[in-house]
Amino acid sequence: EKTVRLQPGVNNLSLPLSIDSPHLWMPNGWGEAALYAFEVSVCVDGKLVAKKQHQIGLRTVRVVHEKDSLGMSFYFEVNGIPMFAKGANYIPQDALLPSVTTERYQTLFRDIKEANMNVVRIWGGGTYEDDRFYDLADENGILVWQDFMFACTPYPSDPTFLKRVEEEACYNI
């Protein structure tokens, strides 16, 4: 537990975290998708005003795109190990996004896991998914290849538009 004092306005914090004998998150088929729970609470004058709980998996993921004997490689490396990607493209489950229940997400990820997939790509013509999607992906050892929502049309390249794209990318990452 750590207490920090915030100033009015935007506060950017970086707090050290220590985990005894940490286990790495592994993709489906490689071992356990180890997750660690953490919680952030905001109190004002001793009164709880906000609380956020989340799970994280400790891992490194890298896209390897290097010159090789055939031209250029392109593969994922997870925790320093090359990964053979087995997955599918994902489009929104329903045109009415709020109608996608937790149970439907759970069924989707059960099916993905049972099909021995380890990655799912969210198509750029779809939508940024609900947090439940990403949480279930983590819990089931599924990497998410997240397209940005820029598909099927040319886009402007003026500074104002590019600034908005940058903001969208930062928000969604």
Question: Residue locations for each model-derived region?
Answer:
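Long, contiguous hydrophobic alpha-helical segments, chiefly transmembrane helices and signal peptides
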Residues: 25, 88-90, 97, 123-125, ...
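Aromatic-lined substrate-binding rim segments of carbohydrate-active enzymes
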Residues: 109-112, 118-163
